[in-house]
From Swiss-Prot:
Binding site for L-aspartate: 118, 122-123
GO biological process: argininosuccinate metabolic process; L-arginine biosynthetic process; urea cycle
Family named by the database record: Belongs to the argininosuccinate synthase family. Type 1 subfamily.
Subunit structure: Homotetramer.
Lineage: Bacteria, Bacillati, Bacillota, Bacilli, Lactobacillales
Binding site for ATP: 8-16, 116
Any one GO molecular-function label of the UniProt entry: ATP binding
EC number, UniProt record: 6.3.4.5
Superkingdom of this protein's organism: Bacteria
Catalytic activity, reaction form: L-citrulline + L-aspartate + ATP = 2-(N(omega)-L-arginino)succinate + AMP + diphosphate + H(+)
UniProt cross-references to Gene3D superfamilies, sorted A to Z: Argininosuccinate synthetase, chain A, domain 2, HUPs, Single helix bin
Cited CDD domains: ASS
Alphabetical keyword list: Amino-acid biosynthesis, Arginine biosynthesis, ATP-binding, Cytoplasm, Ligase, Nucleotide-binding
Protein name: Argininosuccinate synthase
Amino acid sequence: MTEKIVLAYSGGLDTSVAIPWLKDKGYEVIAVVLNVGQPNADFDAIQQKALNVGALDSIVVDAQDEFADHYVAPVIKANALYEGDYPLVSALSRPLIIEHLVKIAHAQNATAIAHGSTGKGNDQVRFEAAIHALDPEMKIEAPIRDFHWSREEEIDYAKEHNVPVPIGKKSPYSIDANLWGRANEAGILENPWNQAPDDAWGMTVSPEAAPDDPTFIDLTFKQGVPVALNDEPMALATMIKELNKLAGDNGIGRIDKIENRLVGIKSREVYEAPAAAVIMAAHHDLENLTLERDVQHFKPTIEDKITNMIYEAQWISPLFDALMAFIDKTQAVVNGTVKMKLYKGNATAVARKSAHNSLYDEDLATYTSADSFDQEAAAGFIKLWTLPTTVFEQVNHVHSEEKQHD
């Protein structure tokens, strides 16, 4: 009996050439594509393309709301930016994709799962770590990695097997996109001294071409998650789409960086994440207003670990669950509205309010006659605050001269 294999399918070059390759190995291929909000994607065409190049069946799963509510929302609450700027665009969708692929594999009595990742990328680890966690007995095929294709060889193989090739050898970008953003690599971008050309960007205008007048928006959060845009309640997936357009039109969300990959190499990545740039900036600003100081100062330690765990394929782990429980606890008070100014590549918080959770007390902060802060208590506080270092210094005189006594 012919074995069935479930392929994580995107419609792109890597996963399209995987279909005839897997068929040559004797598998019946079931292509599965997840709709996680890929901009401008024609899922009917993608589904048909898989069938045209030889898949036994082609399945489309609409997972946009699931992706936003269960994968994007946690990274918003955790301010998760890998190496300080990358909002984990591709890394976020991988465990969700595998969760659905494993379910479909079980339903279809498939014995294997395939992906189109290369041996140099992070996604091979993310896909296979999730498969091992969810079903250790499931076989794994990785044709692009295991056959050692170069990009040029892959294009030639595609043409030999009648797989449509929408790119050329001179500019073979590799693009991955979802609700949360767009990742672009390869081609001219592989030389870090080459500036990203205009055609490398797909969700944003250049900041120079953005409108000369700023756009102002209000983002309302409930327990750390945005729930309304300009006072209009909406699902998170819908809001992200709206903000991708608004922020993208203002040139916001471009990231051009050298990134440390999980597999140990540095890579040049070009990302666009317009909605993420706005939401993350607004969320961080609201935390400044609502989080107690010690919590606010300690939280980045947990955020950094969570961010690295997501990037490094450790979403499915007890430590990740425990750390997210801490994050969720902190977000109970992150309720309020932030006014954002979108202008020529910048998303800036210009006002904020929280009716029930603001820790800002104007009477304490003011320098006017309405000041209620007890300034006379400051001298005693300072003396007690510095007592440990004062005693140490007077005993050891590391930074001071010892007084001579007669």
